[in-house]
């Protein structure tokens, strides 16, 4: 039985000001904000956790950790209470393949059940799958236990509303406020119930396949998939196989500790090697939670989010597929060459801060449907209400097949400008960004 109350714990807050170059939120506990910059484009700083998630901070690279069991249990209870006020009847819980995910899943569902809310378990599933499942059921929210592209030692928790979108700042703050209260377990009669959604992966696979908009298949394609020993290890191969592609699968033996290890979208060397070895048309690398991807062409050349956005925008423009107001949303990291190439096609580019959350907000504000990040987060609101790597891959391959062009020719008009990423360690980023010397340097 759960204790009737637990000591008050420090509140969690996602730092809304600081993000690494891959869009990962730098976590903080209480009101302390993390100001440590990322060490590299693909590696978050000492306090980094998964994007949009709650977590305890990493104390050092040798002593990193997921949220504590007590924190997770209380977070589940607090979220259950707040979602109940919103009319939510159940919460779908998914996770990636980290070993700590099983521990956190148990603690989280215990807290939710103690709040009187039902739980629906789906096991290891891509983050976008949980988003889809939450929105496909009536009055059900979603929770994902993942640290995205980080190593297995880290973990985090992120919430989705019944619309499948990440919860608002206002809802987040209400959960945080509820954390300051003592846990009060509902009566035995009102306790929530836990059940497993047995056909969760099948539902999501069929949804992904339905996003192929034209009457084509991938029968002529040979594709190497690197599923990063992560959340997409089971569903991604099935999707592309059922769409007709010949597939070779890499990094699909998760053991709890090998997620993102020398594989996936943050390390594509093995994928490049296997594409050449197998004479494949493409290689596709997913990240640990399946919301980000990187392509590799037949010559093992990397195609990042900017390349993917260009191909998708060109397909929409030339084939007169709905593109809202003929514009796409990128970020401050988006290559200038993409902006110039889009302008020549009559397609506008609007930039936001780094982070798929910012991209999604701008898309909704402008009523556009396509946006993304250089890191491989691609959002297609005409098919999904969140960034989904599998759907992005389907759309990219669809555009390629329908173009009837070699990839080199399809991308030929896109001339990317050289980019250099420099991380500056500072405790006052606003002062630097507003300084005359910095503006002069950038301009």
Segments and roles (model prediction):
Residues 129, 173-206, 210, 298-372, ...:
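Proline/glycine-rich low-complexity loops and linkers
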Residues 5-25, 31-40, 44-66:
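Low-acidity, Ser/Thr- and Arg-rich intrinsically disordered low-complexity segments
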Residues 319, 323-443:
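Phosphate-binding and adjacent anionic-ligand microenvironments
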Residues 59-60, 64-110, 114-115, 194-221, ...:
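An N-terminal, well-structured beta->alpha segment
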Residues 155-276:
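Gly/Ser/Thr-enriched, mixed-charge loops and adjacent short helices
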Residues 81, 88-154, 238-296:
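N-terminal small/polar loop signature for handling phosphorylated ligands or for N-terminal nucleophile
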Residues 139-154, 275-297, 301-302, 347-388:
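Glycine-rich phosphate-binding loop
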